[in-house]
Amino acid sequence: TIQWPFFLKDPEKGIINEHARDFYNDVIDTILHYHKKPFVSLEHWDIPAAFLKDFDGWCDRKMLEYYRLYARRVFECFADRVPYFFAFTEPNIPIDNGYMDGIWYPFTHDPKKCYQAHFHKMVATAIAKQEYLPFQKKYHGKLGAMIHYTPVYSRSEEIRDVIAAYYADLLQVRIYLDPYLKGSVSKEFMDVLKENDCLFTYEKEDLKLIHDYRIDILGLDYYFPIRVQARETDYEGVFHPTKYYEPYIKPDRRFNADRGWEIYPQAIYDAGMRIKKDYGNFDWFISENAV
């Protein structure tokens, strides 16, 4: 991953830190020396601290043009040798942890800001593809994204459990699969956000960008599934996706006690079949998988 705060010494003006550029050039050249293909991500959670301090990071539209400038600088420096770029690695993690679950900075539960930030990352991915196109035509590389993939399984085939799984999938999985692979933010997704007073603001041009500039390849970071059941109690309080479901612990699951994660290899096959069935057999690979 190229670290945005390290690579640009002035992220507002797009001024490159020459030491950082030389460091990444050395890494890329070393990978090529050993006849390997470098896969380079533009963002794996960290952004310039000033952007968080001054305007709340990805919650603000200002990030879109700053990210455009950053992506352009990365491509200018490395596109001649890097065949695979990725706009984001696990774009949802810092947003969900910071603005929905409140366990990372800024330690808040603000669903409106959360989904605004998610949407801006969807648009930023399209912007990265737009900026990459001239380099793609010259060097024939690909621009993708790597998502934190948590496939959803219902406790049973009982209708209430199936509906719970539908909402978990819509809000936790399709949130990025649909814009990345179909070029659209689903109406069902937007309807749920609107119903819960946390629909993001957007411009018509944003949706056109998402539609017109889609990724070329998808990376799946898979560690564990999400198992859900229908809620047994009514949800109260500020909106959270679990308004529509509760976690379900499968009694006979294989379990990594160190991490607290279920081990379920079948999900990788299921992911491939889902992408084949629902997303036109899109080009994908396993980008992370471990316990």
Put a short name on every predicted segment.
Residues 1-24, 30:
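Active-site-adjacent substrate/metal-binding segments within catalytic domains
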Residues 11-12, 25-291:
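Active-site region of glycoside hydrolase catalytic domains
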